[in-house]
């Protein structure tokens, strides 16, 4: 504590220890006190020598050398003292440096700060700054010791000495367990009198300029330190550094005792104090791995699992600080320490000053005096005598005489609020407050306190606070907690307490200069001011919407992300903002507070005016709205709000924002703000064009449209245009004769409510006369004044003073008979009309309690109350007919709705009066004597209550569904089961109609009504009456019409048994039976409240047609809670036990857990599933579980054939066939066949819905309903038609259909056994044209095919697809085995880039391609054929094959070329390839031959090559056909590697293997190759198949004889296999669209083979390379037993066929997969599903037929797929071929192994990495097929070769 602070207190206060207080005249401090020790420096006197000596030592330690002789300030620099002395001059304040004069001393003080020199003393050695010379001297001594030599560092705790400071620090850690502190030691009482840097805003002084700079940022809001990662700004560099740790994840502060690490040093200190400090009381649990100590075993287990389980080091979370605070809150200090601290606190001279401040605070904070014997209300605001804009702390300081401190709180201070125990357990706060307010009360309380409380109080230390802190301070374990004087909250920082106190005082010192709003915290004001500037600097990255503050942006972003961080503590709902949650939480307490009557009130006092009432003050009703359902009268807004708030229907928690001009309250502050403008006349939203002001932005937007001249709302009748929808709606009244608004006084009708209201003002004089008559009658009889005024409360201006109700709900619950003694005046407004709202104008005796018991004690009291109720008066004339039923839904209601009152009373009375109401009665079956409350409400009705039967069903519905109808309307108290229903109902009160019709502008309350209305515009009347053929637009209109044809009259009058078709007619009739006073019947109020019932009953009638189930008996919340506590006896029935179980599970919620998290939490058992990571205790459980994976259902029902996985399910199912229902419900006597069905049914009675949707707040009775509901959350988007895509070097282009394929040619005829044949022009199809388009084509009379490729048809095309329609078939074409509907087109694709180049080079396609003479192609790369050379391609389609193949990125190019006319193409290596182009001049087929594609090649050179390759046996036509396998690798080409004559563009090429058989050389030297896999080619599996023959050596190499190959010497003709290999140079590839065969010279040495050859034939298992694919296949079979030799280079997956590999490779490429582009021509006859392959269709068909052709030989199980059988067989063999590469686990399926590796070893990341970086050689690859060798094997060995590929 500084000297100046001591002097300040000494001069301002009287200290009882002897320090005298100076009077005002003692200005020069020259006073004399005898026998006192006087200080010569400060002239203070002390009675004792010890005090004087201590005081002098303070001078020596804290004084600066230069002292002011007129005040206690001292200075280190003499110049600063000179400047200071000029402030004491009494004359004009003048600066001694610049001689500038000032009018005020304060201005001079601020000015001389510019001239002051640095006061701090700087160390010349290290530059450290010090305030006092003594501090500098101590510091310099350290430097001298360092220079002198070694220094001994002594431990202050144990006096040990160490040579280095690091050793001392290590040693001090041993004392940390005892002397650790979680907070820094601050000097709470800083002497700021000597600080020279003053804040210009608040006057606070600081020692350093840097401190002042940081402080000023609090006032200016400047945040210069911005985060580079997220843009967040801070006002201090240290805060930014702390924030950056969140991004970096750095935790530099490591605990020395355990592995924990922290980002902040304070968290580390708190951690050390919490887990490493000594625990004095109670058991402790020590960690075996580190030195952590815990008080509970659970904390130790949590610590071990986090820190010592080998996982990542989980440092203590950010919430650990909060746990530290909670843990240390009630830890006690040693008694000696407490006493010592208390003694030191009392010895301080400032204790009296502190007590004065606390006294002032408590006086200011005392609530207003309340009546004796009553405690202040919980919600009552504290009456504070401070000004509205002043801080209570500031006022207390001023009253106590201390210097004031700034009240502005630091906006950036974090509030470490800490809620302590309640006052009963925390005597600290109460003791302080009692001591200060009333000592006598405090003594009495101390006498009554128990010894335990006294012990607790002794263990805790209470210190009085400093002058700056209100309330008390509780210090615990070195932490000072500042207790709020109003509540039990505690804070570490005084500034946090100051801000918190404003919550209680409602002080908002920070006012907005531009509007009326004020705020408690300056940061909130700063954010608010940004809304006035119009600057919206924060933009949403999703929708680009801008916001003025970052907080608003954060809340908005939650709309996009769906984050709802604020959860309700009472239910499962979550909210985006805390304000929404706060509003929602109030709804939980709203009804309970109303029921419990927490806000007690006195009986209502009604003050009625004595003199004439002015006409404008007469309240008018709202116009009656005429609808199809009846007459509806809306609530008058002024009467509703007045009654609503005066009668306390709304609690403060629900509508916290109240208008201080009127009684209205709102849920949101923005609504209040807009409402207040109606009082103040403020219109802040100005139109920039005309200057008009508006109260809201929405009205301004609508107004701006009037300036634009845009009239977007048009009348459909007269074409008139209007600016707004309201103008159009008003205009539409001209075109119709509807007059829906009726005056409630004279029944005159109007088109608009505005005109009706104008008319209704003419009735005010009549109403005023009636009111005067009513007042005169009221003054005659004083005994009935209260009751009459209650009836007129909604028709006149009254003032209701509410204080308290006679009894609370708790008292009523304890003594239900008290409800019977209520006087009528206590039940505010329970007139007959109010009951009529809910009970359809029944007499008051028709109350709910008639359902309880015939001998109800309440009936007499109700009858007595009815006799006391006078005849109702009304301001309306008697002209309103009886037939009108007017809804007056609110202003006639009592304080509590009458039905609600009677429901509460009936429940309480029935519980109290029924002798059978006990725990066991709820379980007993219903009987005449003992039955539960719910059953009695249903079953007991007698002839005495016949008048209630009409409303019984409605009454039951309200009673039974009360627990489920939790959403209540604030206007009429009607209950709903869903919030959406309530929302729609509220619109009937507010008049909101958000759903607008686009055609006529009418608004509707729901989208369903709008949809029905829109049908009226279409004129379509789809609903016809089957009796009279009348048509209606909606189903509801038809339903109402059908009632006219029905002779049934289901609605019976309970008085005369007359029947009616509708409830409306029945209720109108029932009114005739009612005996009510004439005055009551004369008013329109008797019918008031009827429409709500009519609407509700009609709605229930409509729902009755949908639900045929009878009414369900439902237990109330109290009954269910009582049932849950019951333990049923052993003799109880199954139904009774199930009822108790269902009641107990009502609050249980079964949520869907994350599967992976659930598997991790579950314990591991010995019986593990081989398909998934689950494990089970019993082998039988595992067997049942495995059936989920295998799909096995061994238990089959003999009755219906249904199969089940478990036998118990079959047993339950069989009971449904027998009809036995052994389980009966004792509540409603319904019977069920299984116990599970009974359990589900019992939830209807208890209302239990344990199954909660994880995506919303809905709950369901069964998991199946939840599952069905969850499907709505995953509803897929409507499937879009997939557009055909083409992979090419450019983008995928959409085809344009230019051909009408639906037309047919009369010359086409279809025969069953014929083959498609025809003549095609060889020049029609050009080499190198690959793409996609549909071109028109036709067939001439001679059978020639003509395709017209004109410039006009190609001008707008990017991709061209050649499509041959059905009408293109010539007269000699025959079709067999093909559906005529499937031959609409034959697709050949042309690459768009090639087409473009072709058009540019030779204008090839500009002419008509036809077979007419005189037309020849002009392309130099294409040669005309010799017509004398026969050439043909014979195509025989397989059975059921559709000739509609879409060959993706390829085409089949055919053309006749002789040997002399061959096209020469030159590659980069200098070799010339002879392109052999084969022709397609006819489609012929031998009858009965296999379905295959035969290529007859007439080129002599190719024939010779094939003949030599085939060997001598090949010429024999009688031998077996030889097969040639053409393997085309997937290679890439670039434009640079293509020959100059080839117009090809780069494209991705796929792989295809063709198995062809050679039947020998024909007589014309031609060789025929037959392609067996026609389906693979025609379904789009081919890209480009090239057969090249080099010009150098036109011979195939000799047959390779490998002794290792099996089957070579076998019988049968040898077969020729042409094996491909990768070319040495990628540029040698010529991507021609033709069948080419490339041979390699037979003299090719093995050393000259390409280096990539090994990779092309490399074993996937052992990485061994082979020279050919055949050798590799043989090796894979013999060594590894596998046939999958085609491996993916990316993911190493293996396939049997190259086509499968090709399809798989598409998964590694971007864009649609190849399989998705294949045409799905094979359709299922049952479900119309289509497939690309017949095998897929065959497998699919087994689903419908139930065929299971694959049988297990060991257990006779059958499966519909071979793969399922293979998986099943592994169960018998126990084989687990797929081993995990990281652990020893094995799996039967590779997918399970991958799943295991992803979960257990995080293999997914590595897999993605490898997939994202496939190995590339860096060279461009070619797809040209180089046939390297011919391998001869026996034909039998290669029979399965076609299946492999």
UniProtKB/Swiss-Prot annotation:
Keyword Transcription, does the record have it? yes
Tissue specificity here reads: Ubiquitous. Expression levels are highest in skeletal muscle and brain, intermediate in heart, pancreas, and placenta, and lowest in kidney, liver, and lung.
Signal peptide start-end: none
Basic and acidic residues bias locations? 443-458
What InterPro entries is this protein classified in? Transcr_Reg_ZincFinger, Znf_C2H2_sf, Znf_C2H2_type
ZnF C2H2-type span: 37-59, 66-88, 93-115, 121-143, 153-175, 197-219, 225-247, 253-276, 285-308, 482-504, 510-532, 538-560, 566-588, 657-679, 685-707, 713-735, 741-763, 967-989, 995-1017, 1023-1045, 1051-1073, 1167-1189, 1195-1217, 1223-1245, 1251-1273, 1657-1680, 1686-1708, 1722-1744, 1750-1772, 1778-1801
The record's similarity note reads:
Belongs to the krueppel C2H2-type zinc-finger protein family.
Q: Output this protein's name.
A: Zinc finger protein 236
Species, as recorded:
Homo sapiens (Human)
Traced from the root, the source organism's taxonomic lineage reads: Eukaryota, Metazoa, Chordata, Craniata, Vertebrata
Provide the gene name from the record.
ZNF236
């Amino acid at each position: 504590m500084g000297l100046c602070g001591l002097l300040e207190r000494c001069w301002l206060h009287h200290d009882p220890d002897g320090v005298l207080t100076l009077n005002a005249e003692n200005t020069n401090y020259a006073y004399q006190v005898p026998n006192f020790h006087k200080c010569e420096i400060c002239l203070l006197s002390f009675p004792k020598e010890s005090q004087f000596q201590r005081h002098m030592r303070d001078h020596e330690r804290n004084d600066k050398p230069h002292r002011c002789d007129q005040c206690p300030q001292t200075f280190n620099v003499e110049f600063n003292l000179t400047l200071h002395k000029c402030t004491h001059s009494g004359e004009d304040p003048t600066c001694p440096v610049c001689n500038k004069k000032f009018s005020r001393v304060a201005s001079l003080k601020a000015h001389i700060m510019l001239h002051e020199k640095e006061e701090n003393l700087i160390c010349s050695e290290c530059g450290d700054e010090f305030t006092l010379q003594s501090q500098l001297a101590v510091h310099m001594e350290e430097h001298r010791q360092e220079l002198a030599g070694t220094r001994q560092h002594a431990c202050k705790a144990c006096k040990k000495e160490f040579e280095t400071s690091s050793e001392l620090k290590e040693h001090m850690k041993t004392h940390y367990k005892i002397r650790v502190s979680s907070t820094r030691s601050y000097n709470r009482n800083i002497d700021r009198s000597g600080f020279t840097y003053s804040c210009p805003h608040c006057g606070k002084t600081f020692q350093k300029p840097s401190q002042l700079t940081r402080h000023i940022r609090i006032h200016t809001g400047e945040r210069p330190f911005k985060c580079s990662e997220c843009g967040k700004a801070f006002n201090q560099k240290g805060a930014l550094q702390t924030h950056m740790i969140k991004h970096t994840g750095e935790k530099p502060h490591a605990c020395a005792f355990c592995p924990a690490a922290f980002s902040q040093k304070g968290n580390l200190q708190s951690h050390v104090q919490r887990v490493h400090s000594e625990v004095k009381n109670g058991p402790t649990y020590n960690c075996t791995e580190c030195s952590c100590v815990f008080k509970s075993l659970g904390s130790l287990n949590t610590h071990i699992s986090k820190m010592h389980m080998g996982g990542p080091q989980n440092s203590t979370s950010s919430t650990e600080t909060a746990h530290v605070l909670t843990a240390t809150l009630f830890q006690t200090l040693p008694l000696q320490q407490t006493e010592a601290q208390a003694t030191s606190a009392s010895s301080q001279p400032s204790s009296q000053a502190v007590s004065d401040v606390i006294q002032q605070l408590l006086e200011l904070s005392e609530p207003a005096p309340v009546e004796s014997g009553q405690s202040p209300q919980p919600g009552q605001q504290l009456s504070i005598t401070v000004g509205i804009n002043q801080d209570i702390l500031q006022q207390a300081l001023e009253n106590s005489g201390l210097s004031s401190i700034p009240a502005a709180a630091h906006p950036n201070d974090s509030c470490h609020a800490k809620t302590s125990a309640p006052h009963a357990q925390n005597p600290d706060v109460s003791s302080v407050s009692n001591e200060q307010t009333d000592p006598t009360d405090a003594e009495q309380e101390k006498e009554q306190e128990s010894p335990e409380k006294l012990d607790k109080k002794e263990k805790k230390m209470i210190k009085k606070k400093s002058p700056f802190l209100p309330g008390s301070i509780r210090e615990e374990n070195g932490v000072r907690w500042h207790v709020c004087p109003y509540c039990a909250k505690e804070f570490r920082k005084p500034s946090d307490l100051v801000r918190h106190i404003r919550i209680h005082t409602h002080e908002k010192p920070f006012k907005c200069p531009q509007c009326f709003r004020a705020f408690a915290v300056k940061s909130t004001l700063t954010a608010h001011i940004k809304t006035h500037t119009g600057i919206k600097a924060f933009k949403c990255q999703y929708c680009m919407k801008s916001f003025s503050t970052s907080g608003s942006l954060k809340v908005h972003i939650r709309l996009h992300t769906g984050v709802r961080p604020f959860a309700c503590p009472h239910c499962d709902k979550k909210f985006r903002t805390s304000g929404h949650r706060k509003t929602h939480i109030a709804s939980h307490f709203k009804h309970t507070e109303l029921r419990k009557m927490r806000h007690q009130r006195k009986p209502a006092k009604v003050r009625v005016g004595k003199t004439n009432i002015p006409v404008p003050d007469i309240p008018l009703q709202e116009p009656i709205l005429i609808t199809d359902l009846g007459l509806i009268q809306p609530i008058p807004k002024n009467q509703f709000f007045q009654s609503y708030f005066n009668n306390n229907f709304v609690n403060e928690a629900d509508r916290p924002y109240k208008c201080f001009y009127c009684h209205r309250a709102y849920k949101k502050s923005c609504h209040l703000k807009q409402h207040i403008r109606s009082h103040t006349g403020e219109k802040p939203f100005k139109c920039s064009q005309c200057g008009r002001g508006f109260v809201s932005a929405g009205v301004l937007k609508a107004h701006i449209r009037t300036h634009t001249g845009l009239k977007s709302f048009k009348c459909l009748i007269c074409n008139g245009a209007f600016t707004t929808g309201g103008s159009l709606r008003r205009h539409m009244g001209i075109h119709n004769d509807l007059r829906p608004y009726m005056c409630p006084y004279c029944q005159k009708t109007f088109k608009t409510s505005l005109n009706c209201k104008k008319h209704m003002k003419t009735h005010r004089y009549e109403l005023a006369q009636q009111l005067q008559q009513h007042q005169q009658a009221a003054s005659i009889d004083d005994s009935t004044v209260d009751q009459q005024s209650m009836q007129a409360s909604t028709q006149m201006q009254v003032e209701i003073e509410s204080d308290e109700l006679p009894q609370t709900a708790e008292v009523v619950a304890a003594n239900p008979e008290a409800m019977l003694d209520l006087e009528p005046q206590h039940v505010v407004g329970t007139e007959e009309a109010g009951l009529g709202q809910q009970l359809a104008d029944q007499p008051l005796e028709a109350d709910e309690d008639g359902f309880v018991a015939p001998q109800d004690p309440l009936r007499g009291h109700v009858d007595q109350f009815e006799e006391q109720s006078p005849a109702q008066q009304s301001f309306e004339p008697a002209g309103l007919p009886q037939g009108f039923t007017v809804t007056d839904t609110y202003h006639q209601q009592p304080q509590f709705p009458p039905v609600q009152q009677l429901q509460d009373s009936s429940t309480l009375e029935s519980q109290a009066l029924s002798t059978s109401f006990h725990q066991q009665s709820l379980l007993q079956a219903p009987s005449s004597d003992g039955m539960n409350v719910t059953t009695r409400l249903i079953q007991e009705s007698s002839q005495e209550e016949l008048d209630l039967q009409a409303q019984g069903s409605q009454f039951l519905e309200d009673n039974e569904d009360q627990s489920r109808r939790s959403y209540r309307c604030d206007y009429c108290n009607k209950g709903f089961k869903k919030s959406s229903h309530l929302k729609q109902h509220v619109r009937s009160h507010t008049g909101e109609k958000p759903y607008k019709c686009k055609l006529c502008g009418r608004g509707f309350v729901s989208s369903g009504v709008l949809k029905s209305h829109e049908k009226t515009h279409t004129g379509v009347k789809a609903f016809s009456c089957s009796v009279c053929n009348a048509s209606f637009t909606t189903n509801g209109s038809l339903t109402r019409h059908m009632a006219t044809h029905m002779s049934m009259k289901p609605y019976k009058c309970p008085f005369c048994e007359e029947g009616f078709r509708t409830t409306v007619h029945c209720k109108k009739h029932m009114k005739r039976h009612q005996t009510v006073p004439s005055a009551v019947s004369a008013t329109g109020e008797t019918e008031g409240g009827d429409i709500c019932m009519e609407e509700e009953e009609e709605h229930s009638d409509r729902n009755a047609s949908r639900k045929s189930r009878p009414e369900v008996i439902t237990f109330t919340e109290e009954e269910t809670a009582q049932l849950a506590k019951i333990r049923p006896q052993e003799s109880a029935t199954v139904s009774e036990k199930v009822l108790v179980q269902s009641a107990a599970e009502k609050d249980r919620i079964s949520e869907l857990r994350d599967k992976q998290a659930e598997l991790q939490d579950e314990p591991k058992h010995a019986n593990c599933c081989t398909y998934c990571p689950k494990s089970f205790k019993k082998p039988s459980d595992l067997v049942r579980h495995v059936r989920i994976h295998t799909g096995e259902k061994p238990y089959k029902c003999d009755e219906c054939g249904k199969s089940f996985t478990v036998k118990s399910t079959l047993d339950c199912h069989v009971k449904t066939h027998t009809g036995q229902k052994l389980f009966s419900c004792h509540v409603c006597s319904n019977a069920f066949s299984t116990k599970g069905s009974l359990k589900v049914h019992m939830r209807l009675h208890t209302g239990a819905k344990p199954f909660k949707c994880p995506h919303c707040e809905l709950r369901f009775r069964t998991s199946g309903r939840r599952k069905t509901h969850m499907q709505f959350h995953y509803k897929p988007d409507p499937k879009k038609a997939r557009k055909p895509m083409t992979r090419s070097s450019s983008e995928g282009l959409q085809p344009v259909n230019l051909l009408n394929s639906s037309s047919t040619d009369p010359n086409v005829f279809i025969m069953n056994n014929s083959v498609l044949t025809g003549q095609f022009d060889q020049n029609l199809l050009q080499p190198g044209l690959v793409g996609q388009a549909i071109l028109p084509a036709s067939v001439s009379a001679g059978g020639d095919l003509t395709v017209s490729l004109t410039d006009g048809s190609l001008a707008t095309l990017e991709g061209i697809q050649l499509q041959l329609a059905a009408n293109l078939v010539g007269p000699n074409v025959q079709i067999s085995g093909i559906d005529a509907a499937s031959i609409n087109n034959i697709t050949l694709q042309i690459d768009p880039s090639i087409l473009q180049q072709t058009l540019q080079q030779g204008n090839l396609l500009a002419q008509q391609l036809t077979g007419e003479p005189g037309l020849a192609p002009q392309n130099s790369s294409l040669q005309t054929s010799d017509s004398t050379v026969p050439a043909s391609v014979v195509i025989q389609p397989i059975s059921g094959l559709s000739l509609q193949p879409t060959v993706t990125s390829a085409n089949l190019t055919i053309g006749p070329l002789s040997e002399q006319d061959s096209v020469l193409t030159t590659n980069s290596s200098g070799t010339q390839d002879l392109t052999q182009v084969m022709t397609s001049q006819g489609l012929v087929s031998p009858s009965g031959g296999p379905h295959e594609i035969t290529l007859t090649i007439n080129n002599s050179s190719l024939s010779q090559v094939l003949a030599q390759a085939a060997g001598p046996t090949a010429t024999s036509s009688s031998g077996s056909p030889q097969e040639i396998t053409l393997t085309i690798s997937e290679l890439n080409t670039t434009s640079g590697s293509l020959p100059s004559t080839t117009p090809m563009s780069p494209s991705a090429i796929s792989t295809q293997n063709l198995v062809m058989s050679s039947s020998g050389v024909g007589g014309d030297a031609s060789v025929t190759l037959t392609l067996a896999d026609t389906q693979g080619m025609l379904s789009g599996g081919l890209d480009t198949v090239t057969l090249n023959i080099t010009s150098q050596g036109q011979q195939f190499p000799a047959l390779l004889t490998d002794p290792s190959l099996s089957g070579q010497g076998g019988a049968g003709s040898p077969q020729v296999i042409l094996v491909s290999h990768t070319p040495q140079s990628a540029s040698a590839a010529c991507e021609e669209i033709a069948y080419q065969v490339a041979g390699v010279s037979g003299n090719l040495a093995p050393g000259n083979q390409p280096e990539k050859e090994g990779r092309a034939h490399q074993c996937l298992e052992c990485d061994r390379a082979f020279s050919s694919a055949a050798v590799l296949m043989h090796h894979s079979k013999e060594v590894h037993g596998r046939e999958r030799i085609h491996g993916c280079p990316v993911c190493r997956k293996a396939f049997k066929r190259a086509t499968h590999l090709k399809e798989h490779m598409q998964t590694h490429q971007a864009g649609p997969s190849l399989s998705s582009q294949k045409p799905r021509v094979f359709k299922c006859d049952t479900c119309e599903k289509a497939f690309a392959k017949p095998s897929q269709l065959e497998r699919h068909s087994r689903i419908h037929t139930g065929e299971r052709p694959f049988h297990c030989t060991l257990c006779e199980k059958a499966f519909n797929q071979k793969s399922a059988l293979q998986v099943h067989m592994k169960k018998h063999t126990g084989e687990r071929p797929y081993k995990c590469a990281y652990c020893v686990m094995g799996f039967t399926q590779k997918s399970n192994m991958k799943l295991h590796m992803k979960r257990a070893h995080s293999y997914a990341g590595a897999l993605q990495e490898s997939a994202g970086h496939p190995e590339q050689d860096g060279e461009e690859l070619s797809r040209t097929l180089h046939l390297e060798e011919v391998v001869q094997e026996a034909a039998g060995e290669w029979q399965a070769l076609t299946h492999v590929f």
